[in-house]
């Protein structure tokens, strides 16, 4: 099917004819042809490449084209693709069985690694970031005996009913305020305020006195574009939230699904030192397989069944193959790896800035550690409203020129760019060359 998006030219469509055919087949059996909406290229147009293999920093598609990967499976692949040590750990574990329905030492090893690197005292392993945040919210409600959750506009915590209200990520990409199917009752238990607006947080607690179980926040947002939770003067928004939550008998849930073990050895906790009462993890902790975790203070975690009254379970939770992948990924994620990630992010940002400046394109690089996004407006965006108010119309043209020149960037202006340690000098040279037409396209784009 030919695209009607003006950012996708006919020559590019022809180069992707095998991927286009694969997408047509996918649409016969899968809604929209994808199993997660952001993969559908809804905000940029065109058809996503169908990936057949990946190695190091490179993706290969059904048309035989290769791409420098700056999506990294939306975060997990900090070491690049098919890292031999991770692949060997998966193969070795799989050869001894795929799932047992009984405890294994691997899940204890991964839990111990998480505890040793972060503020949490006990961990429960689950299968996805959504499951982690859903379970953390249930536990917070069970522990406090309260029903309401305070979240921030533009922050995304998975597709949990109550947390999809005014969410970011794919919800922002498709311009949805929430989602049909979410009941009024679920929405009524969610209090939403603008991000980094501490007075709005105080007001919300005053208006819902004794009802809010927890504040949930991304450690630093990456689903409305990248927004730092540490202000220009060094103030930690998370520290302010924790103080207010505790003063009102509520908990602080820090969502580190995206930031955990990506922005540093200790995740975002290593950046601001703010320990959530509960913390969620995903992406990097899985090594690329379906796994996630949540943890926190021992007295709270011990409210979980079988030792406490709050029920949470999963047939494949703690799956040995996923545990082996996650553990191998974390073992490789030492301080040298994070220095490389930081240097790679810095180098990419420098190239983007240089290219856009050359074409006089107004922009600001939104950065939080090794995560960043491009905001097509002057100055820092600090909340969802400011991020949406930028010249977002410039991004599709920018994106497609990058894609046509072998760079796989996030297919939405509201998503974070991710780097890996596998990037090479040749990759940076390819990126620099691709930025020349991409910056020109961004400059020429019209609303």
UniProtKB/Swiss-Prot annotation:
For this protein, the record's PROSITE patterns field holds:
AA_TRANSFER_CLASS_3
Q: What is its main location?
A: cytoplasm
Q: Does the keyword DNA repair apply?
A: no
PTM N6-(pyridoxal phosphate)lysine: at which residues? 283
Please give one Pfam family short name: Aminotran_3
Q: What class of enzyme is it?
A: isomerase
Question: Is Protease there in the keyword field?
Answer: no
Q: Which GO terms describe its cellular component?
A: cytoplasm
Q: Name one GO biological process term.
A: protoporphyrinogen IX biosynthetic process
Instruction: Tell me which UniProt keywords the record has, alphabetically.
Output: Cytoplasm, Isomerase, Porphyrin biosynthesis, Pyridoxal phosphate
Quote the HAMAP family the UniProt record gives: HemL_aminotrans_3
What family does this belong to? Belongs to the class-III pyridoxal-phosphate-dependent aminotransferase family. HemL subfamily.
Name of protein: Glutamate-1-semialdehyde 2,1-aminomutase
The record's gene field reads hemL
